[in-house]
Every structure is written in structure tokens, then in C-alpha cells.
Amino acid sequence: MRITRALVTGGAGFIGSHIVDELVSKGVETYVIDNLSTGTLDNLAQHKASGLLHFMAGDAREVEELLHDTSIDVVFHEAAIASVPKSVSHPLLVHDVNVNMTLQLLNYCVKAGVKRFVFASSAAVYGVLEGRATEDMACRPNSPYGAGKLAVEDYLHAYRRTYGLETVMLRYFNVYGPRQRYSDYSGVITIFINKLLEGGRPVIFGDGLQVRDFVHVDDIVQANMLAMESANAVGEMFNVASGRATSILELVRIVKELVGAKGIEHQFTPPRPGDTKFGLASMDKIRAVLGYDPKVEMQGGLKGV
């Protein structure tokens, strides 16, 4: 599919800004809608002189007012409250942003004749896992965040069947990399690094034996570009991960070595509601269908965080 104009919601944020980087490098005229609640214009500053970037401050629900009659070929929907803990403490807010806002964006896409919609879903749709997650397994989310992402996936299937909108769902696992924001709801890698750099003791929820599948943001971008370009992607869900298992205890050890803080002891606290013990992806489908090949290994990828 030939792409001349793309919209990235949440395009000033961690993952969205990296997608913008790749689109601009491909010569795609790129529109960004972001309310800057977690994103920053610093993430887009390198594109000011390109003539290809158009930034609009606002909510994705305002897409019609912001874009007017601009013709868009593909939408990358990255805007969300991406936090399991926040969905537990504020379920109605997270549902409104992650589900209701997406529905309004989908309605815009149908009215405006958008060809393809690439959705940032999540491994949280699976719930409690005992082995590698495969896309055809039953999803039983154990958090409001995961339930919301799964609800949107169902809507995307319905919009494809009803209106012909080409939809692709990318189930991100634990994403890390440059520009990841540090806050209470950040990814665990960013939290550990910042805590150790401040001389504090990193906090591990549970026993630290939880297994995660960490994937670098560059590989997330690769998956998004394949989702944009491949006819085989339409109507499909794909795990996006590295396929490599890392325990939280092993992660703490690696991060301590990286920042030169081996002498700082970590501390344990009870597990949080909605957290899972095991989170590892099967990569078979995305490799076979899209040719996805994760490039960044953790030791090298952490150095750029």
C-alpha cells in the first residue's frame, strides 16, 4: 500500500515519537495529535525543518476539528493511558481514554476514508499465562487495562467487517528504550534506572521471579512499519516482543551493573493487583506472516535508555 500521509496519535510520546521518526525518514507526511500529558515536543524537535511534520495539540477525540479535510492513509493509534496499576485505581478514566476515545477515532477513520488503522494493543489482553502467549489462545485479562485493550480489538474486527477499514492489532509486550518517561507508572526498566541513579533502593513487587519479555522500541517500530506495508497484516493480531525471557531479579542485576550500583540492595514488597507472574511471547506468527525479526538485545538496548 502506498502511504503519503499518516496520523500518529500520542506521537510526542515514547513509542509514538519513534514511529514518527521512521515515517519522516521514509518521506511520509506525518500528522501528530498529542495532548502532551505524557509526551513532549522535545521528542519531535529534530523534525522541525523537515517540512513533513505537522503537530496538533489536543485529544484524539478532536481529530475532525484538528485535521479538517486532510486526507490520511494510515493511522497509528498510540495514545492511551498505558498502565495496569492506574487502570486498577482509576478504571473509569482509563476506559474512557483507552476505549471510548478509540471508538471516536474509528468513526472518524470510516467517515474520512482512512485505509488502514494500526492499533497499539497489549500483552495484558492475555491475563495469567502459564506458557508462551500465542495469538489464537483464549484471552482472559485480569486487569481493567487488559480488558479495555481486548474490547478495542473486538471493535476493530467489527469495523473491518462492517465498514472495510483495514485494521491491524499489535500486542506489545514490555517495551523499553530512549525517551521512556520516568513516573510511578513507567516501565520497570526506567523506574529501576532512575531509582539507582538517585542512590535509592529499587523496589520489586513480589518475589522477583516474574518473567517478562522485554522488547526495544526500535523493534516495536519495525513491527509497525510491517503492519503498515503488508497486505497480510489486515485483520490480524500479532505479538510484538523479543521472545527472550528475563526475570525481574535478573533485570535488577543487569541494571545495577549498567549504572555502576552493584552495592545497592533492592527491596521486596507485596505484588500489585493485576500483575502477572509470567509474560513471554510466541513469535511464530509475526515472523511467518510479516517477516518480523527483533534486532536489539537487552544488554545493548539498555545503554541507550
Residue ranges and their predicted role:
Residues L66-T70, Y108, K195, A223, ...:
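CheY-like receiver
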Residues M1-V175:
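N-terminal Rossmann-like NAD(P)+-binding domain of SDR-like oxidoreductases, especially those catalyzing
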Residues E22, K26, Y108, K195, ...:
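Short alpha-helical functional segments enriched in proximate histidine and acidic residues
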Residues G39, R61, S89, V97-N100, ...:
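Residue-level signal for the nucleotide or nucleotide-sugar donor/cofactor binding architecture
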Residues S17, N107, L150, D154, ...:
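Generic recognition of well-ordered alpha-helical segments
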Residues L197-V305:
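C-terminal substrate-binding subdomain of Rossmann-fold SDR/epimerase-dehydratase oxidoreductases
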Residues G131-R132, N142, D154-R212, V217-L226, ...:
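NAD(P)-dependent short-chain dehydrogenase/reductase
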Residues G13-G16, D42, R61, P85, ...:
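Short, flexible micro-motifs
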